[in-house]
Amino acid sequence: MIAVNQYFDGKVASLGLSNSFGKFTIGVMAAGEYEFNTSSGEIMTLVSGKWFIQLPGSTDYMPYPEGSSFEVAANESFKLKVLEDCGYLCQYK
């Protein structure tokens, strides 16, 4: 079954699915700043748009261009500065 998720007053939305690929969501984010907490490991890939990421333990935001990924362990938090509306893929580990 496909799960529909909305966060931050509808500024972040995703569709979740589990299949032979694994558990993942495909979503969109409006431009803005967000903080997410993880309950499992995540691999985030920017499909389209522009964002900067502050990974756990860092004070700096780093650019991750379209097609690039970053990984966050379970029970961590990370911050995003989304500079333009974007599309992303999140794979759960």
Give the label of every model feature segment.
Residues 36, 53, 89-90:
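Short hydrophobic/aromatic-rich beta-strand segments that constitute the beta-sheet cores
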Residues 1-16:
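Extreme N-terminal tail/first-helix region
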Residues 73-93:
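Ligand-binding loop in jelly-roll beta-barrel domains
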Residues 54-56, 81:
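A generic structural motif
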Residues 39-53:
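Short, conserved beta-strand element in jelly-roll/cupin
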Residues 10-11, 19-39, 66, 71-74:
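Conserved short histidine dyad/triad with adjacent acidic residue
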